[in-house]
Amino acid sequence: MKAKREALLSLFQAIKENKVDEDIVELLLLINSIKGVYTTSSCSGRIGIIEEPSLGAKPLSRWLIKVHRPIKFEEAKKALKNAQKGLIFLKSQPPIFHVVTESLELARKIHEIGLSSGFKYTTYKVISRRYLVEINGTEYLTVPLGKDGKVFVTDEYLEFVIEIGNQMLMRGKSRLPRLREKFEELKEEVGEDPLFTTLSTEKLSL
């Protein structure tokens, strides 16, 4: 219960500070309201341009622009002017949710929820006597654009990959309503967590 309490307080604070992706706030609140379940880091899907010192050097990477809605060509062009050192990629990534459960039974149910909602990369594993379910889609796109501040692709090609990336982003997001429906069904089955009810009333005035 202590871990969920801390997770809820962190989520509520992030919501108040507008640090949670707007289109998944209600879904996150729904998931966290379920008994024996809470979320950690989650994202509604994003697209952007990232600069990496070398392949796989994620800790040192730098987003030149990152948005959770379709990106505009003009935004991408402007962001590319700030490239300095390293490999430049356009990346589009689907929604991802990290859901912790207190039982294997709940983990299996949420695993099935993810898969049946179209998130085909959904998996789960054991961490510190709890179960972590990663609800993840397949709509990943990574396109190299240049290196060390130089862009090697034409505007026409950049427009093309942005269009594809935006389509993939929205395809991933289109599965969110189905995911919400499934979690609503789970809540009806499992019940609402009194801790969520108490804390949300105090912190969010829901």
Curated annotation (Swiss-Prot):
- EC number(s) per entry: 2.1.1.282
Q: What superkingdom heads the lineage?
A: Archaea
Reactions accelerated catalytically:
4-demethyl-7-[(3S)-3-amino-3-carboxypropyl]wyosine(37) in tRNA(Phe) + S-adenosyl-L-methionine = 7-[(3S)-3-amino-3-carboxypropyl]wyosine(37) in tRNA(Phe) + S-adenosyl-L-homocysteine + H(+)
Gene Ontology molecular function, alphabetical: tRNA methyltransferase activity
> What InterPro entries has UniProt attached to this entry?
Taw3, tRNA_yW-synthesising, tRNA_yW-synthesising-like_sf
Classification via Pfam families: TYW3
Give the keywords, sorted.
Methyltransferase, S-adenosyl-L-methionine, Transferase, tRNA processing
Which GO BP terms sit in this record? tRNA methylation; wybutosine biosynthetic process
Question: Tell me, what does this protein do in biology?
Answer: S-adenosyl-L-methionine-dependent methyltransferase that acts as a component of the wyosine derivatives biosynthesis pathway.
Q: Which NCBIfam families match?
A: PRK04235.1-2 (NF003264), tRNAMtaseTaw3 (NF047731)
Q: Name it.
A: tRNA(Phe) 7-((3-amino-3-carboxypropyl)-4-demethylwyosine(37)-N(4))-methyltransferase 2
Species assigned in the record: Pyrococcus furiosus (strain ATCC 43587 / DSM 3638 / JCM 8422 / Vc1)
- Gene name, please? taw3-2
